[in-house]
From Swiss-Prot:
Highest taxon of the lineage: Eukaryota
Primary role: Component of the tectonic-like complex, a complex localized at the transition zone of primary cilia and acting as a barrier that prevents diffusion of transmembrane proteins between the cilia and plasma membranes. Required for hedgehog signaling transduction.
Key word Nucleotide-binding present: no
Transmembrane segments: 666-682
Topological domain spans for side Extracellular: 26-665
Protein name: Tectonic-2
Lineage of producing organism: Eukaryota, Metazoa, Chordata, Craniata, Vertebrata
Designated gene of the protein: Tctn2
Side of membrane Cytoplasmic, spans: 683-700
Membrane topology field: Single-pass type I membrane protein
Signal peptide feature range: 1-25
BP-aspect Gene Ontology terms: cilium assembly; protein localization to ciliary transition zone; smoothened signaling pathway
Iron-sulfur keyword on record: no
Amino acid sequence: MGSLSPLSFLWGLLLLQGVLRPLRGDPVFIPPFIRMSSPEVRASLVGGSEDVTVSLTPLQIKEGVLPVPTCGGLRNETGDWNLTVSPQANMLEVTVRWKRGLDWCSPDETASFSEAPCIVQTLLVSASHNASCLAHLLIQVEIYPNTSVTHNASENMTVIPNQVYQPLGPCPCDLTAKACDIRCCCDQDCQPELRELFERFCFSGVFGGYVSPPSHHRCAARTTHQTPDWFPFLCVQSPPSTSPFLGHFYHGAISPRHSPGFETHSHLDLRDFFADASYKQGDPIMTTNGYFTIPQASLAGQCLQDAPVAFLRNFHSVCTTDLEVQERDRLIPEDMRIRTTGGLVTPTVTYEEATDLDKLITSPDTILSAGSAPRNVTVEEHYVFRWQNNSISSLDITIIRAEINAHQRGTMTQRFTVKFLSPNSGGEKEFSGNPGYQLGKPVRALHTDGMNVTTLHLWQPAGRGLCTSAALRPVLFGEDASSGCLLEVGIKENCTQLRENVLQRLDLLIQATHVARRGNSDYGDLSDGWLEVIRVDAPDAGADLPLSSANGMCPEVPTHVTIRILTAEAGAVEGEAQREILAVETRFSTVTWQYQCGLTCEEDKADLLPLSASVKFINIPAQMPRPTRFQINFTEYDCTRNELCWPQLLYPLTQYYQGEPRPQCVAKGLMLLSLLMLAILLRHPWVGMCKAWSSASIQH
């Protein structure tokens, strides 16, 4: 083994000293050794730092030997070095700073890199008490001129070449101007002698400067073991300047076109005359500018602003918008043209004003400012398409807008609906199938008193989720769903009135008395497949129940309604299964409501009572499942289908016989078997055979 240098030996002693001293509770520098390459370094003195003096001294190394450290007559100001001590929690933070800085290192701005360091020196930081040394910190200083960028940025304009013909940024790893970047072999600022130090560790790929590698399709490219089997069966003769990688790494952005305000849209593009489009169910609807899009809610709950609309797909979406975020600029409906068979369709747009914004806006805080003009926001958008065969004949758009303050805060609920109607459809009720129900279509319903009831409903909460602001949405066939809302109840609420109020809100969901058995049942003929809704009566709202007179507590409050719908498959039409409804039942669930108080019960503060509703579709098989191949081929062994049951031939000996104990049955069976064998042996053929064998043996 080679001998250790004095500097390495001293560093090892200081490191060992730094490891052992905290175990004894003595002061120690952490770390005990620092290799300094920047103008400033820091260390910490921990362990008994009270009444400790910290000082700095440069060490003069003679013939590779360090002098013995002493703690007498040391100063904080030592030549070009400055020592600062800052007390911290249970420690002292020691900062050593070089006064001259890096500006002194590079007086020549044209020099890109200097192989010789700017300063090489050894410093010793000592902690002492009453001239007695307690701890030492050894600092090895070696600072180069290009440790950091010291040059001013050039104000010259950089000419960016066209990347189609010349790679943009041929050396991406060249991050420092007028300085050599380590491991960047394409950096022109690196001297050959310096590049030799790291040329084996150069950055690879595009970051290392290989922005235009040679294509393996070129005949001049060298083949490797990783080339495909078909290469070089075909190759291309082309110069390196026409590399296919030019422009490959360019990802440009599309800048919007700003049209002048005086530009009119009365002119028609020649392409519009040939904009012919034929649709089938599920195809995206096209406009002259691209896809026809409407904000829609995704599966993750986010609102997609540019979701395409599919042909013959009705939908209803709800999006929540932050009022502080600027509303996106969308295409003006009047300027939109729908592509269809035979030309273009111009929509008919109707604007309406929204009322009662409190039901749509949550936390309606307004910051008033002088001279702030109101702004318009879109609350609802309704699109009605008229279609015939594979084309769109007309489009009616109804936009409901509201005027709010320019500094309105909170969130707003927006609704978007799309509906497709045939051209001969008028005010008649829309079918939900023909004849059976289609999945996702509303459940058809009616009221015998002639009320305008067409379906069952669930709540569609908005804003704060209160029942007073909740809208209604139809129950869709085959889709289990649940919804709810919050009802404000005071501490002095009358229980009878509370039950009546809750029952009234729950009855709004199921006002219908009959439900259509099929999707095309006639509303005018009650005998055309209409089923009466089976209702399980809710508790009497006016009944005198116990605890009903106590403030803040009401028993037997109906807060949940369950709608069970029995469905079945009733044949098929042209290979399509037809589903129908067999029965509908509604059932109420009650709870005991109690006012929830915090630290104190405030009489003027309302509590929130949650109301909920759920719908459940239960599928009942209309017929037995088709028998399998095993059931068809092996019915001869089925005792329930045949008069002769072979598996029960030895019934007393099988496990199905329970008349006697199992051991007794086995004993009787063995006895019966032995008697049977004896009877067979004593029969006439066996006796004749025995006599013949006996006579044959005598003759021999």
